[in-house]
Amino acid sequence: QSAPGNEAIPP
C-alpha cells in the first residue's frame, strides 16, 4: 500500500 497522498510514484 502506498503512503497517503502518493500515487504510484516510482522509487
UniProtKB/Swiss-Prot annotation:
It comes from the Eukaryota. The modification Pyrrolidone carboxylic acid is found at residue 1. It is found in: Secreted. GO terms for molecular function: peptidase inhibitor activity; toxin activity. Expressed by the venom gland. GO terms for cellular component: extracellular region. One of its GO terms (biological process) is regulation of blood pressure. Keywords: Hypotensive agent, Metalloenzyme inhibitor, Metalloprotease inhibitor, Protease inhibitor, Pyrrolidone carboxylic acid, Secreted, Toxin. Signal peptide: none annotated. Its main location: secreted. Belongs to the bradykinin-potentiating peptide family. This peptide both inhibits the activity of the angiotensin-converting enzyme (ACE) and enhances the action of bradykinin by inhibiting the peptidases that inactivate it. It acts as an indirect hypotensive agent. This is Bradykinin-potentiating peptide 11c. The lineage of its organism: Eukaryota, Metazoa, Chordata, Craniata, Vertebrata.
